[in-house]
């Protein structure tokens, strides 16, 4: 029983350590939405095909929702608070233009 508790404790700690509160990534002023996505997002959001970057829900299929998610992150997604202004707009436009809606 002690071994099970130890394994569970170590597993929980590993999961918590993996949860990052935010990234300090700041895109170049002239970075395209695709470049920002490739650098900041594609490590977790692998493109599904040549023309589909990811699948998003209908509730996320708008620019404001995407930008809010990028800034705040979630339990499973790192926040990117330094993707601001025009760069955030370009990223959101890229995601919308290259995603399928579920």
What do the predicted segments below correspond to?
Residues 81-102:
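C-terminal capping alpha-helices of c-type cytochrome domains
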Residues 11, 40, 73, 95-98:
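Alpha-helix boundary/capping residues
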Residues 1-7:
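Bacterial N-terminal signal peptides that target proteins for export
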Residues 20-22:
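Bacterial signal peptide processing site
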Residues 7-13:
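Sec-dependent N-terminal signal peptides
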Residues 28-38, 43-78:
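Gly/Gly-Pro-rich "capping" loops immediately C-terminal to redox-active cysteine motifs
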Residues 15-18:
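C-terminal motif of bacterial Sec signal peptides marking the signal peptidase cleavage site
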């Amino acid at each position: 029983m002690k071994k099970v508790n130890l394994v569970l404790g170590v597993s929980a700690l590993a999961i918590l350590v993996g949860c990052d509160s935010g990234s300090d990534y700041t895109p170049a002023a002239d970075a395209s939405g695709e470049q920002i996505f490739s650098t900041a997002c594609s490590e977790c959001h692998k493109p599904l095909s040549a023309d589909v970057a990811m699948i998003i829900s209908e509730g996320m299929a708008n620019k404001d929702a995407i930008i809010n998610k990028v800034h705040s992150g979630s339990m499973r997604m790192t926040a990117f608070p330094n993707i601001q202004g025009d760069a955030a707009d370009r990223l959101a436009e890229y995601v919308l233009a290259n995603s399928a809606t579920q």
